[in-house]
Design a protein with these regions (language model features):
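Residue-level recognition of the GNAT/N-acetyltransferase active site
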Residues: 89, 94, 98, 127, ...
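Conserved acetyl-CoA-binding loop of GNAT-fold acetyltransferases
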Residues: 138-147, 217, 321-330
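Conserved acetyl-CoA-binding loop-helix of GNAT-fold acetyltransferases
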Residues: 93, 99-112, 276, 282-295, ...
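A short beta-loop-alpha structural element at the N-terminal edge
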Residues: 12-25, 194-208
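Acetyl-CoA-dependent GNAT
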Residues: 16-20, 27-83, 89, 202-203, ...
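Conserved beta-strand-loop-alpha-helix junction that forms the acyl-donor binding cleft
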Residues: 124-133, 307-317, 334
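Acyltransferase donor/substrate-recognition loop-hinge adjacent to the catalytic core
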Residues: 2-6, 154-202
């Protein structure tokens, strides 16, 4: 999408995307010079049909043709979030209709939908050196968000040999961090051997809700249910995990990996939540989950994992930095709020 000031033209009708719009969306996406993301777009449209309350997808029409589209998903509870927001997933305007205010009209429609549904913020991210996209975000009213994006490479030995400082870090971590790993770099291996870490399934819902309630002190059943559905149905690759000790679920890690989020053309794993039952803390459960996640991601040839953290959440940042995370080359942006 080019970035010069848009010249408004006659307002185009805007309506919700429908299943029959798939081919048009794929064609516009391809016309913008991107690698084919047909499967990703198809999953996003299907997800909106399954759970319309969690998705907002609109298009601008030019006669019988689509002039542009925008897709977003509701964010509900990632790392303690209390107020809902919208995650901008995909936006595109047909090249010959750019510079005519179509993108702005689509974002305005998205923002209006969010306000009606209690989601007053529109969130997204971009690489700091994607100057064209950053200029467009600026023109559309986005500003830098407070969240800090951190990421790390999924290296050959990072998960098995990463050392972690054993002391507790300060700050509000929402209880979603286990600081129990010993400084000895064999602890991750031992924890993974002791804990039964396996791919998350729908049958785990009640156990995950139980652990989450013990960690956060809140009932986030709806959020957990929706995240589990996203992990099972919406992502191209299932990477969420549970950890069991003595036959019961004592921790979980929710992550997703897909091709297309935020306009990226390479798959990246995104960590949404990690939690360990406080009764099973200081036993390396968090380390075991991360260790297995790294092994799985390497097998899938996914090279990076990222998450977003409140800058004042020093406890969570300390835990992630100890696992090899560092500030990302991507910046978080927000509109509204």
């Amino acid at each position: 999408m080019t970035t010069a000031a848009a010249t408004p033209s006659a307002a185009l009708p805007i309506r919700p995307l429908a299943p029959g719009d798939l081919e048009a969306v794929v064609a516009i996406d391809a016309a913008l010079g991107r690698r084919s993301r047909r499967a990703y777009i198809e999953r996003r449209l299907a997800a909106a049909l399954r759970e319309p309350r969690l998705h907002a997808q609109f298009c601008a029409t030019d006669g019988d043709a689509l002039a542009g589209y925008v897709l977003a998903r509701v964010l509900e509870g990632e790392f303690g979030r209390s107020a809902p927001a919208l995650r901008l997933e995909l936006v595109g305007v047909r090249p010959e209709r750019q510079q005519h205010g179509v993108g702005r009209a689509l974002l305005d429609a998205l923002a209006a939908w969010g306000q009606r549904h209690g989601a007053n913020e529109l969130r997204t991210s971009a690489a700091w050196n994607d100057h064209a996209l950053l200029a467009w975000f600026d023109a559309m009213g986005f500003r830098l968000a407070a969240g800090l994006i951190v990421d790390r490479a999924v290296g050959d030995d990072a998960d098995d040999e990463r050392r972690e400082d054993p002391q507790d870090a300060p700050g509000d971590t929402h209880g979603e961090v286990d600081y129990g790993l010993q400084a000895d770099n064999t602890a991750a291996l031992l924890a993974r051997d002791r804990a039964d870490v396996r791919t998350m399934s729908r049958a785990d819902l009640a156990d995950i809700v139980r652990v989450d309630r013990r960690v956060t002190g809140r009932d986030r059943s709806a959020y957990i249910d929706h995240k589990l559905a996203e992990a099972m149905d919406d992502a191209a690759i299932r990477v969420s995990l549970t950890a069991r000790l003595d036959g019961q679920v004592v921790g979980f890690l929710m992550a997703r990996a897909d091709l297309g989020d935020y306009g990226r053309i390479d798959p990246v794993a995104v960590l949404d939540t990690i939690a360990v039952d406080p009764a099973w803390g200081h036993r390396g459960v968090g380390a075991a989950l991360f260790s297995q996640l790294g092994i799985n991601l390497r097998a899938l040839r996914i090279e990076r994992i990222e998450t977003i953290v409140a800058p004042q959440d020093f406890g969570l940042l300390g835990f992630l930095y100890a696992r090899g995370f560092a500030p990302s080359q991507r910046l978080a942006f927000v509109r509204g709020g």
